Amino acid sequence: MRSGREAAVPGAVSGALERLLGERIGHVKVIEYSWFARVHGAFATTRLHRIYLRGSAAEFFTNPWLMLHEYCHVLRQWQTGSLTAPRYLLECLLHGYWNNRFEVEAREFADHNAPQLHSLLAATPHSSPPHPDAQPSSASRR
């Protein structure tokens, strides 16, 4: 089993995300093969300025929907202070994982923006083609 390490976001992916999101993403570290994600039983989990992946960053970067879902958590929730560990746990206790407001918001954000990110990535030279299953059924569990 590999141990976690920071992965570089490919330039084409970074450019497309920044164009769509309207802000820089360079301060967000992507950690692949993370024990933290594995401990949480998640494909990915986030914290302030961090996306922790169970698997490879290469696979993550080919999935526009999942990238948007995770970057939404980091940029629109953790970074603004609306998402904290205690708030997330309370939401899960009150509403369950699927219906907690942070997951609902991230799924809606990804649903709304994935087609545009898919197009931006497809139009970018030297980008990997988006993953055919661009919207996983359970996205990521926190």
Positions of PLM-derived features:
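Metalloprotease/metallohydrolase-associated module, dominated by Zn2+-dependent proteases
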Residues: 1-42, 46, 78-142
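Short pre-active-site segment immediately N-terminal to the catalytic Zn-binding motif
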Residues: 41-44, 50-68, 97-98
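Active-site recognition of the HExxH zinc-binding catalytic motif
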Residues: 65-77
